[in-house]
A protein has these predicted regions:
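Tryptophan-anchored aromatic micro-motifs
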Residues: 2-48, 55-73, 106, 181
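Edge beta-strand at a domain terminus
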Residues: 3-9, 151-246
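Glycine-centered flexibility motif
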Residues: 18, 137-141, 179
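Beta-strand elements of well-folded, non-transmembrane domains
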Residues: 24-29, 62-69, 110-113, 169-175, ...
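Predominantly extracellular/secreted and cell-surface proteins with exposed
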Residues: 40-172
Length: 246
């Protein structure tokens, strides 16, 4: 817990330094489909805060993600290898005291997934771009998303992404940090295992940020593997959101 809720900036920074379990949800809408498809992507990982020359730095490492889709019987998912290939840049965070509570802002630092190049430039839309990479090492360009529709159909799409997210968090009295994520990422479908799947798909975040929460919970520094995190997931985080299916 944050002892005597830090009233000055330096003590607030020191209070935040540590190793955290990371949970976030991003709610997306894809209007390129016949009926709007909504998706929750729930990400798990570790966030570390440390001081460097008086600056409070944030480092993130993602280990596992779940995808929930509003369309009945449609499932999709990224392998843990693909999730672990997402490498946000270490970045300074800003702290401000608002109404007696410390607010933290992590600004967007674009990073590329499935393609190399300049992350500050728009994502390439060339399916034969020579800079395509295979970070999940499955022999296909970009990262692979597996898709299934009931028992009738399954396939894969191969995507690249330019991850662009920022966090707005509040330091709570119990030492947790909670808030929401703003995601302006870009996605490009490089190819697919079946022609029907090779369609543009670029979901945008749902405008209600309440559907895209972030929760960081301080944990012991020796808990640092995906297996250890997922073992204690239920004791740290809320239940994953679900879509109501008729």
């Amino acid at each position: 817990p944050v002892a005597n809720y830090a009233s000055d900036l330096e003590n607030a920074k020191k209070a935040i330094v540590g190793h955290y379990a990371h949970y976030d949800v991003v709610a997306y809408e894809d209007t390129t489909t016949k009926t709007t498809m909504r998706t929750f992507i729930i990400s798990y990982g570790f966030t570390d805060f440390y001081l460097e020359g008086g600056k409070l730095m944030q480092s993130d490492r993602f280990v596992h993600a779940e995808q929930k889709i509003s369309t009945k019987n449609v499932k999709s998912g990224l392998s843990d290898k693909a999730v672990q290939a997402i490498k946000p840049r270490v970045h300074e965070v800003e702290l401000t005291l608002v109404d007696g509570k410390w607010q933290m802002y992590r600004s967007a630092t674009p990073s590329l997934l499935g393609i190399s190049g300049d992350p500050l430039k728009p994502l390439s839309t060339d399916p034969n771009d020579p800079n395509l990479t295979d970070p999940d090492h499955d022999g296909h360009p970009g990262v692979t998303v597996k898709i299934s529709v009931g028992n009738f159909f399954s396939g894969e799409i191969y995507i690249t992404r330019r991850e662009i997210f920022s966090n707005y968090l509040t330091l709570n009295a119990d030492g947790t940090l909670s808030g929401y994520v703003v995601d302006k990422s870009e996605q490009f479908v490089v190819g697919a295992s079946k022609k029907i799947l090779a369609q543009p798909s670029n979901s945008v975040q749902h405008p209600d940020y309440g559907l895209s929460p972030v929760l960081l919970v301080p944990i012991s520094a020796d808990i640092d593997t995906p297996e250890e995190l997922m073992q204690i997931r239920d004791s740290l985080f809320p239940r994953e959101p679900e879509f109501k299916t008729n």
